Amino acid sequence: GNLKGCKAIMRDFAPRVKAFLSLDDQSTHVCARAVGSARYRITADTRGGHSFADFGARSAIEVLSRLTCALYRQALPRAAGGVTTYNVGMISGGTSINAIAQHAEMLYEYRSNDAKSLAAMKEKLNVILRENALPDAKVTVELLGERPCGTATDPAAQKALETACCAALKHYVGGKKPISVGSTDCNIPLSLGIPSAS
């Protein structure tokens, strides 16, 4: 998970690697542009209470709902050729219908094929967390994983690798295979400037 294997390979051998080829379980395209990402677990804890007797007490679910709304109102960074996205993929919490939730958590991620946009999204997350801080709620953020996006490589070497991969795919699978973007083991070598394709 989180490209740990590829990170270890590059940590030990990057200076000796001229090009990197990853064989994934798909044959529909050649992936040669890296989409980076950051994934978080955001947890809210409050005093909670009974829905009638303690009405008005802060709910952990409400805290995360406020954060989710703020995240979905954010403006995305604009970069030439860059695409940036975000998603709250899961929210869970509470114990029963008549209990004000004491605990809730959500999973949030953002992705981009532009390194500056990834950095901007990280800063935006920190700003949103600060702006939505509440005195009667504790919010914790746990980084679950980070993947870098690709940076510029030697254009001629990268093009040669892409051409060879497309030719091999066409020979064995048929048809013209487009160059695509994605999140693969190639993220790591591409982020180090090593020509790579998957």
Language model: regions and residue ranges:
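Acidic/histidine-rich catalytic neighborhood of metal-dependent amide-processing enzymes
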Residues: G1-S37
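Metal-dependent amide/peptide-bond hydrolase catalytic core
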Residues: D25-A32, R41-D45, G49-S198
